[in-house]
């Protein structure tokens, strides 16, 4: 066992995890996706071919590669290539509008773009700095076909691997998304020996930080099969678990809720007893939902608390959580967390304050090309995600709110300023304040409170027109689910809209405001 852990760590340190597993069990299926399968040997060979392609086209270590791709084998192949070729990979959310995807591809300084061309965001984005465009799936003008290109290169292991990095984008509080750049993510990958029958399910989009880490990267590291689903279907997920005898998965609370909403006779149709480990995070989970899941699948549900920027190692098992419902885990190291008031002073045990985490010495983060935002997120050797919480007498952390303006809907982070910036371009809108309001299924939903320009009056028809206009400029999940018109918005003495005051009435009477 120790020998295998050592081999895993050494392979991960150079980005060669699939090379290790190609040697150990090369003919074992590594990827099941909705249209194809790949063995560990095939994934490894494709990764080597992609590296050789990128090198031939002039990319050097540290250069950026953008990947706009659904949950399919090619996503893993390009990821594996960047990990061993020394490239900085940015997965792009394929739900984004053309303008949003275009901004990220350009902002990350991508020199190569691998894209599934069924998405308009891939084919219509203007990306003049990209020198290599590779189509996954259907061909498209201006793109070179993935399979045809790879066939021109040797699949044998490269002899000079250098571990790469990744940069994920998080929506910006002032409008544009920001790249969260962590230079040494390989240093965060902890080796773990899998059971011989382990199978991982990736039920969320692989471009998202949590599925990328807990489903894709962990299965790569441990050498276990990964089952991809492209779109969520509650009963379909149960069928996949039964068919592939899935043992592990990362899920988010809205997935729990949708599974629990299935009729009991439907849930009983499928054997999910193979499940041994479920991990969840990304959004607060209502205690009654989590308790119902534990009652159904057993005490196999583990919760973590962290962000793309990092965290303090909070994780809580089902057994612990049942004694402390609502907690996100016990403080693993007193030096890893500080809870501060608005003046930067430590709060007393039991009092809420802004959470600050110690910066990882292994993989510190920066907001790409934004030193001001990087500095604003830090206090010395600590940084904040903008969350508010407290530690109880036993050292368990409970979240109570957020100082940041982030909306978390179905586990997806949405920053309202980005929405406001688009809504005020509508001819009827004078000003906008977008907030998250309670939603029993999604946790929060997007609501925009608007003031109107002279000559316009609030109406259902105008609200629908503004929503339709927003759909042309924003990803669907950012479009306000509801719109309210008001005569004025509360402002600070400096004239800034006080989003917190707009939000408060919708959360009145609730134990927490997230």
Predicted regions and their residues:
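AMP-binding/adenylate-forming core of the ANL superfamily
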Residues: 349-363, 382, 388-389
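ANL superfamily adenylate-forming
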Residues: 35, 121-168, 176, 262-263
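AMP-binding/adenylate-forming catalytic core of the ANL superfamily
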Residues: 52, 75, 96, 113-115, ...
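Conserved AMP-binding A3 loop
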Residues: 39-41, 165-189
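Conserved AMP-binding/adenylate-forming core of the ANL superfamily
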Residues: 10, 29-72, 76-80, 97-102
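Gly/Ser/Thr-rich phosphate-binding loop
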Residues: 168, 221, 246-251, 262-323, ...
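Conserved AMP-binding/adenylation subdomain of ANL enzymes
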Residues: 185-202, 207-247, 262
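A short helix-loop-beta submotif of the ANL/AMP-binding
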Residues: 64, 70-90, 94-98, 106-112, ...
């Amino acid at each position: 066992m120790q020998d295998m852990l050592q081999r895993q760590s050494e392979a991960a340190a150079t980005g060669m995890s699939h090379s290790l597993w190609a040697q150990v069990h090369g003919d074992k299926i590594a990827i099941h996706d909705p249209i194809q399968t790949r063995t560990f040997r095939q994934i490894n060979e494709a990764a080597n071919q992609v590296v050789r392609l990128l090198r031939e086209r002039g990319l050097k270590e540290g250069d950026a590669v953008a990947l706009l791709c659904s949950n399919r084998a090619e996503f893993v192949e390009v990821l594996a290539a960047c990990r061993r070729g020394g490239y900085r990979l940015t997965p792009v959310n394929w739900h984004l509008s053309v303008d949003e995807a275009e901004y990220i591809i350009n902002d990350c300084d991508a020199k190569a773009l691998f894209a599934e061309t069924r998405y308009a965001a891939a084919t219509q984005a203007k990306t003049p700095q990209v020198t290599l465009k590779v189509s996954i799936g259907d061909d498209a003008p201006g793109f070179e076909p993935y399979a045809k290109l790879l066939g021109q290169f040797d699949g044998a292991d490269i002899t000079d691997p250098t571990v790469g990095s990744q940069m994920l984008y998080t929506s910006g509080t002032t409008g544009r998304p920001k790249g969260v750049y962590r230079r040494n993510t390989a240093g965060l990958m902890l080796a773990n020996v899998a059971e011989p029958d382990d199978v991982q399910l990736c039920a969320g989009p692989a471009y998202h930080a949590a599925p990328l880490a807990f489903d894709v990267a962990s299965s790569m590291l441990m050498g276990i099969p990964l089952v991809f689903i492209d779109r969520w279907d509650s009963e379909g997920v149960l069928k996949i678990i039964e068919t592939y005898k899935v043992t592990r998965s990362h899920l988010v609370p809205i997935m729990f809720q949708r599974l629990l909403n299935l009729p009991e006779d439907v849930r009983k149709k499928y054997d999910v007893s193979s499940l041994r480990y479920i991990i969840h995070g990304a959004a607060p989970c209502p205690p009654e939902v989590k308790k119902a899941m534990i009652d159904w699948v057993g005490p196999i549900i583990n919760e973590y608390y962290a962000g793309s920027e990092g965290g303090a190692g909070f994780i809580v098992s089902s057994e612990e959580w049942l004694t402390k419902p609502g907690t996100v885990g016990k403080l693993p190291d007193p030096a890893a967390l500080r809870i501060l008031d608005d003046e930067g002073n430590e709060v007393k045990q039991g009092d809420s304050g802004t959470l600050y985490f110690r910066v990882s010495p292994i993989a510190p983060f920066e907001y790409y090309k934004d030193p001001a935002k990087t500095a604003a997120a830090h206090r010395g050797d600590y940084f904040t995600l903008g969350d508010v919480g407290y530690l109880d007498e036993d050292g368990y952390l409970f979240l109570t709110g957020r100082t940041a303006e982030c909306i978390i809907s179905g586990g997806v982070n949405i920053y309202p300023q980005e929405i406001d910036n688009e809504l005020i371009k509508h001819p009827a809108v004078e000003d906008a304040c977008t907030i998250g309001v309670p939603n029993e299924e999604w946790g929060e939903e997007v609501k925009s409170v608007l003031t109107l320009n002279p000559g316009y009056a609030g109406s259902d028809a105008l609200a629908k027109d503004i929503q339709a206009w927003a759909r042309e400029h924003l990803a669907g999940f950012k479009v306000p689910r509801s719109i309210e018109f008001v005569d004025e918005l509360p402002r600070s003495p400096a004239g800034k809209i006080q989003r917190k005051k707009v939000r408060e009435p919708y959360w009145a009477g609730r134990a927490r405001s997230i």
